[in-house]
UniProtKB/Swiss-Prot annotation:
Gene source species: Anaeromyxobacter dehalogenans (strain 2CP-C)
SUPFAM superfamilies: VC0467-like
Matches recorded under InterPro entries: AlgH-like
Official protein name in the record: UPF0301 protein Adeh_3962
TM regions (residue ranges): none
Pfam families, per database record: DUF179
UniProt GO cellular component terms: cytosol
Length: 197
């Protein structure tokens, strides 16, 4: 059984305000996985990177790439999860009847997160893995940094809603999150800030 994630702003989302000029986070929707006294960790879930699932899996094991092709997942983009450790691979997935749980953290709202090669291989090899995203890198904040940025209006917290990740097209996730906050994306203007790189 997956262990639980820490409380605070996580699990949840941070919706970037339009005035957030940092190119790593402008227009981003960040899934917050950890938030505690030592800082915070999250993943941008709406920024496709230049490589695909097939590129990553083919680099690990050609049979995994072939399974992804057979499942119609080979051309899915790998997301840019954030500027910290951009070579580190993470897996965000919706646990299902055959999806592995070993090595994963349950975030709630039907989402789980892991970062091991074993988890990725088990997920791709499972009979019906369900939806998953691969992400490279993460967003990290020093102690009290994200609280300061939220206070300045650079980010607006949104409760965790798993459908935003897997049921809303990537290019519509930020706009959908803004609308769920009860705001009009065209008129959503607040302060600035940024996460640490």
């Amino acid at each position: 059984m997956p262990k639980d994630a820490p409380a605070g702003l996580a699990p949840g989302f941070l919706v970037a305000a339009p005035a957030l000029a940092d190119p790593n986070f402008n227009g981003s929707l960040v899934l917050m996985a950890e938030h505690h006294a030592q800082g915070a960790l999250g993943f941008v879930v709406n920024r496709p990177g230049p490589i695909t699932v097939a590129d990553v899996l083919g680099g690990l094991d050609e049979r995994l790439r072939e399974r992804a092709e057979g499942a119609g997942r080979a051309d899915d983009p790998v997301l840019v999860g954030g500027p910290v450790q951009p070579e580190r691979l993470w897996i965000l997935f919706r646990p299902g009847p055959t999806a592995p749980e070993e090595g994963a953290v349950a975030l709630g709202s039907g989402l789980a997160l892991g970062g091991s090669r074993e988890l990725l291989e088990a997920l791709v090899r499972s009979r019906d893995p369900g939806p998953y995203l691969l992400l490279l890198g993460y967003a990290g904040w020093a102690p009290l940094q994200i609280e300061h940025e939220v206070g300045e209006g650079a980010w607006v917290p949104l409760p965790l809603q798993g459908d935003l990740v897997f049921d809303v097209p990537m290019e519509k996730r930020w706009e959908t999150a803004v609308r769920r906050l009860g705001l009009d994306p065209a008129g959503f203007l607040v302060g600035g800030g940024g996460a640490e790189a």
